[in-house]
Swiss-Prot record:
This is Olfactory receptor 5P69. Keywords: Cell membrane, Disulfide bond, G-protein coupled receptor, Glycoprotein, Membrane, Olfaction, Receptor, Sensory transduction, Transducer, Transmembrane, Transmembrane helix. GO terms for cellular component: membrane; plasma membrane. Residues 1-28, 79-102, 158-199, 262-274 are extracellular. Belongs to the G-protein coupled receptor 1 family. Disulfide bonds join 100-192. Residues 50-57, 124-136, 221-240, 296-314 are cytoplasmic. It is found in: Cell membrane. GO terms for biological process: G protein-coupled receptor signaling pathway; sensory perception of smell. Glycans are attached at residue 8. PROSITE patterns: G_PROTEIN_RECEP_F1_1 (PS00237), G_PROTEIN_RECEP_F1_2 (PS50262).
Amino acid sequence: MAFLQDGNHTAVTEFILLGLTDGPILRVILFTIILCIYLVTVSGNLSTILLIRVSSQLHHPMYFFLSHLASVDMGLSSSVTPNMLVNFLVKQNTISYIACSIQFGLAAFFGTVECFLLAAMAYDRFVAICNPLLYSTKISTESCIQLVVGSYIGGFLNASSFILSFFSFIFCGPNRINHFYCDLAPLVELSCSDVSVSVVVTSFSAGSVTVITVFVIAVSYSYILITILKMHSTEGRHKAFSTCTSHLTAVTLYYGTITFIYVMPKSSYSTDQNKVVSVFYMVVIPMLNPLIYSLRNNEIKGAIKRQLGKKMFC
């Protein structure tokens, strides 16, 4: 049953996710591609976490943050990808009201934690390059734990505002969500109640997270750039730039897609374009992050070689 009679209203008890496409051939192709991406995402991020845990050379603050980023990337992708894969296999993919709220909240939680972790990693690079003598004091084990715990608390608070908004919506008519997961915009379109307050609350909450984290990242890299330009050694400049390149690439990809989805006016792009960008944001980027951080990081590449060497000679 998709609807439940409640007094003068018909309450929606489940939703239908329309997914990415109706074409049977395209569905098979997309299923194969996204399944491969998801498997690479899980294996790549798990490998990153395990490598950092077993390699004493990687027991540094930067890699502590990176291990949590890998965990969050797996969570972000897993909040939507398995259900999306099911959508390709069934004729009509339904999701219950409660399951929709959980998916909605998890996507908001992991997306928010990623923002805070990227900001924490930018601050870590700022201290390492601009104040190297104070690095061990400012980025202590206790400080790292506080920054990570703060990131998860921030994610929980922002996700709570999204979930509370979801439960304030009244769905009494159409139940077809034109997306591959329960996102805010299509849910707002389906609601038959006044959503103005809820939209303001979620916009303020998500907007605050974005502004705060972007500000921290921008200020950190402004000081980093100034410090690098003042360096007289070409080798020192190259080393400083190389430590920041991976993180800057990840930040650009992540915030670039967030800007397209949540900041640009909805009239400037179609729903289908939004779906494609959402796939990149929630499915592709979590796969790319381990590759971005490992391919340009000599310490990680060295740790991989050492672990492979141990396996070969055991």
